[in-house]
Amino acid sequence: MKINLDRTSSGFCIGVQGTIHVAEEKLNNPDKLFSLGDVVHNEAEVNRLEHLGLTTIDESGFHELKNAQLLIRAHGEPPSTYRIAEKNNLVITDTTCPVVSRLQRTARLLHELGYQIIIYGKPSHPEVIGINGHCKNSAVIIKHPDLSDPSETGQIDLKRKTALISQTTMDVPGFYELKANIRNLFAADSEEIRNENDHLWMAIRDIDLTASLTGIRDMPRYVYKDTICRQVSSRNQMLHDFAIANSCVIFVAGKKSSNGQVLFGICKAANPCTYFIEDIDEIDDAWLTGSDGRTVESVGICGATSTPMWLLEKVAAHLQRRYNHDPA
């Protein structure tokens, strides 16, 4: 059986790499380091870092923490976190992903300009909670691009000027599907919008925000900014092709990983013989056996942006020992 390990489109994204690198450096120091929430949505990697000395705390633990070192993970945090940290005399090491930081700034400026903010994302995701905090927790969060959830659409004020942005790890097609459906929702409520073309929903850049804030020119009533991380979204096609190229696919990710669920779905759609695991003890021998009782010709091992490469290598080594009788 040929074992193919995907080193191109799997493993930590740049934002997570930065967080892990900084955490490892800090853990070489004698001062205890605390992480607000799991440093990454992968239990095996969290366990590795905790073995090195990292302590993971939840919100209640954070409020009680005083005079300590605090790590802000790549997902970012709302402004309230920084205020509490200052009050509790916490020394912050901020590893918010630069892509997320720019998105937080965009959300804050759009809110200051009076826009109703719609975020394409998952309401409970840490990144979305952070973004929403930068617009004073006033954003409408939409998870379903087809607008099928009335509890989401019911929050949209059709009379307000509106800006659409996205969680950085959501899917690009879903974002543009949501944009089209929101435009139709507003158009159904307004004859003025029905009589206009798509330019009413203008794609904006940072320069447009600056121009509007400084009074050089105003932005349209309805705007959108595609804030999806292209380093993440570019993996979609590569993983699709990787899945097709193998008889069977073992997809490795943490069950909490939002990106993992999306990428697993892409692999599964490309190759129905795709299976999700967190670690090697979840591998079922039946997955790797063909209808003739022989092992499959090839197995591909891949994972999410929150999956460490060492874990993918561990899975590959396990399969090599078990199926190719390699003692290495």
Curated annotation (Swiss-Prot):
Binding-site positions, (2E)-4-hydroxy-3-methylbut-2-enyl diphosphate: 41, 75, 125, 168, 257-259, 306
Known pathway: Isoprenoid biosynthesis; dimethylallyl diphosphate biosynthesis; dimethylallyl diphosphate from (2E)-4-hydroxy-3-methylbutenyl diphosphate: step 1/1; Isoprenoid biosynthesis; isopentenyl diphosphate biosynthesis via DXP pathway; isopentenyl diphosphate from 1-deoxy-D-xylulose 5-phosphate: step 6/6
Keywords: 4Fe-4S, Iron, Iron-sulfur, Isoprene biosynthesis, Metal-binding, Oxidoreductase
UniProt-listed GO biological process terms: dimethylallyl diphosphate biosynthetic process; isopentenyl diphosphate biosynthetic process, methylerythritol 4-phosphate pathway; terpenoid biosynthetic process
Role description: Catalyzes the conversion of 1-hydroxy-2-methyl-2-(E)-butenyl 4-diphosphate (HMBPP) into a mixture of isopentenyl diphosphate (IPP) and dimethylallyl diphosphate (DMAPP). Acts in the terminal step of the DOXP/MEP pathway for isoprenoid precursor biosynthesis.
List of residues binding isopentenyl diphosphate: 41, 75, 125, 257-259, 306
Reactions it catalyzes: isopentenyl diphosphate + 2 oxidized [2Fe-2S]-[ferredoxin] + H2O = (2E)-4-hydroxy-3-methylbut-2-enyl diphosphate + 2 reduced [2Fe-2S]-[ferredoxin] + 2 H(+); dimethylallyl diphosphate + 2 oxidized [2Fe-2S]-[ferredoxin] + H2O = (2E)-4-hydroxy-3-methylbut-2-enyl diphosphate + 2 reduced [2Fe-2S]-[ferredoxin] + 2 H(+)
Cofactor section: [4Fe-4S] cluster
Active site: 127 (proton donor)
Pfam short name (any one): LYTB
Signal sequence coordinates: none
Organism: Chlorobium phaeobacteroides (strain DSM 266 / SMG 266 / 2430)
Binding site for dimethylallyl diphosphate: 41, 75, 125, 257-259, 306
GO MF annotation: an example: metal ion binding
Family according to the record: Belongs to the IspH family.
Binding site for [4Fe-4S] cluster: 13, 97, 229
Entry's EC annotation: 1.17.7.4
Name of protein: 4-hydroxy-3-methylbut-2-enyl diphosphate reductase
Cofactor note: Binds 1 [4Fe-4S] cluster per subunit.
